[in-house]
């Protein structure tokens, strides 16, 4: 699937489904589940590498995991989900040339067909414009942006009128410069719905209500694999307990 094809989903009113994967095992499962898009998220810093934020993950680690994701797909190339990879912290904030090099490294050496970038500050917008001119598709990300945790924390964003006006302005700018879609994270459903109606490009929600053009979730959150989930990502099963019980049963059988 090409990034621009997601616009057709919006035109037809078809919900876009995005799940994370970080290795070949998870990508095979997510592909089998029928997700439209696989996001190799920098959240792997926390879920895989044990960090408390996304900030420590490196470009080399993102490349390593995206390559592993590509090896897990079983469908023919033209039937595989679209793969979007997060550009990690400080891979694009330090200038356009560094951003092009980072995104180019991912697209040249892995299955990624697009990158995701957080924010819409003037410097970030310039980077996005440059990447798109270079032929690199970009997904935007607004609202709660985890790479800005030291400034924003993990609180819900755009709760007052000023914040909502800013979010709308940023979303319009993201569309104007050529992003093929935008993620809205942890914002009120009312403003997310407004943005969804205003934009021609797909708006993907996570903790942004049900009226977006699609939803993205961290696979480990949906499967209940951690002992703590964000309030907007209710687990479908208690996978952690299921795994522990199954493995405990095996250990006990051997010991007894």
Swiss-Prot record:
Keywords: Cytoplasm, Magnesium, Metal-binding, Pantothenate biosynthesis, Transferase. Pathway: Cofactor biosynthesis; (R)-pantothenate biosynthesis; (R)-pantoate from 3-methyl-2-oxobutanoate: step 1/2. Belongs to the PanB family. It is an enzyme of class 2 (transferase). This is 3-methyl-2-oxobutanoate hydroxymethyltransferase. Mg(2+) binds at residues 42, 86, 118. Its cofactor is Mg(2+). GO terms for molecular function: 3-methyl-2-oxobutanoate hydroxymethyltransferase activity; magnesium ion binding. One of its GO terms (cellular component) is cytoplasm. Binds 1 Mg(2+) ion per subunit. It comes from Prochlorococcus marinus (strain SARG / CCMP1375 / SS120). Homodecamer; pentamer of dimers. InterPro entries: Pantoate_hydroxy_MeTrfase (IPR003700), Pyrv/PenolPyrv_kinase-like_dom (IPR015813), Pyrv_kinase-like_dom_sf (IPR040442). Its main location: cytoplasm. The active site is at 185 (proton acceptor).
């Amino acid at each position: 699937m090409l990034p621009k094809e997601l616009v057709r989903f919006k035109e037809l009113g078809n919900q876009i489904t995005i799940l994370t994967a970080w290795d070949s095992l998870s990508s095979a499962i997510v592909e089998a589940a029928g997700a439209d898009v696989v996001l190799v998220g920098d959240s792997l810093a926390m879920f895989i590498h044990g960090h408390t934020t996304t900030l420590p993950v490196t470009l080399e680690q993102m490349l390593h995991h995206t390559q592993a994701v590509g090896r897990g797909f079983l469908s023919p190339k033209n039937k595989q989900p679209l793969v979007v990879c997060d550009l990690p912290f400080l891979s694009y904030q330090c200038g356009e040339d560094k951003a092009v090099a980072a995104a180019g490294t991912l697209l040249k050496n892995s299955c990624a067909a697009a990158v995701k970038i957080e924010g819409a500050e003037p410097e970030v917008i310039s980077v996005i414009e440059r990447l798109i001119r270079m032929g690199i598709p970009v997904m935007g990300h607004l609202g709660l942006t985890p790479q800005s945790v030291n400034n924003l924390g993990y609180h819900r964003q755009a709760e007052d009128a000023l914040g909502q006006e800013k979010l709308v302005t940023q979303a319009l700018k993201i569309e104007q410069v050529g992003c093929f879609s935008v993620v809205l994270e942890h914002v009120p459903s009312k403003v997310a719905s407004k943005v969804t109606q205003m934009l021609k490009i797909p708006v993907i929600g996570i903790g942004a209500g049900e009226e977006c053009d699609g939803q993205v979730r961290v696979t480990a959150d949906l499967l209940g694999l951690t002992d703590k989930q964000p309030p907007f990502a209710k687990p479908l099963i208690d996978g952690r307990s299921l795994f522990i019980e199954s493995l405990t049963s095996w250990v006990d059988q051997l010991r007894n």
